[in-house]
A protein has these predicted regions:
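Glycine-aromatic micro-motifs
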Residues: 1-118
Length: 118
């Protein structure tokens, strides 16, 4: 089966949550998304507040986890990431090696207060 690399930030940093969403997910490495910052641009009715998103911002970085998972599970992840769209992003690992990975961003960004979970 084909495997893909997925850059997680926000609530998907929680290994229990990722395991429930994508049982095949395994931590591959820590990574940094350059020239972005973390913001809360999507209102989650499930969490009753703003959910994390990555927003372009020169000079800042967002750290996350790159998981390796079965490509077949991407459709499951798409459903969980309902208000987000799948994107391809360049990240760097802690050895400064470059990787192109799948992640999710909010297409229509607004500003919300983060949920209490953050």
């Amino acid at each position: 089966m084909s495997r893909v690399l997925y850059f997680a930030y926000g609530s998907n940093l929680d290994p229990e949550q990722m395991a429930s969403r994508c049982p095949s997910a395994r931590v591959a490495f820590l990574a940094r998304l350059a020239d972005h910052r973390l913001d809360f641009t999507y209102f989650s009715t499930r969490w009753s507040g703003g959910s994390a998103d990555v927003v372009r911002h020169f000079g800042e970085s967002v750290w996350g986890i790159v998981y390796q998972l079965d490509a077949a599970e991407l459709q499951r992840l798409d459903r969980f990431e309902g208000g987000y769209q799948r994107v391809f992003l360049p990240v760097r690992d802690d050895q400064e090696r470059s990787w192109h990975v799948i992640s999710y961003e909010v297409p229509l960004k607004r500003s919300f207060r983060p949920t209490h979970g953050y």
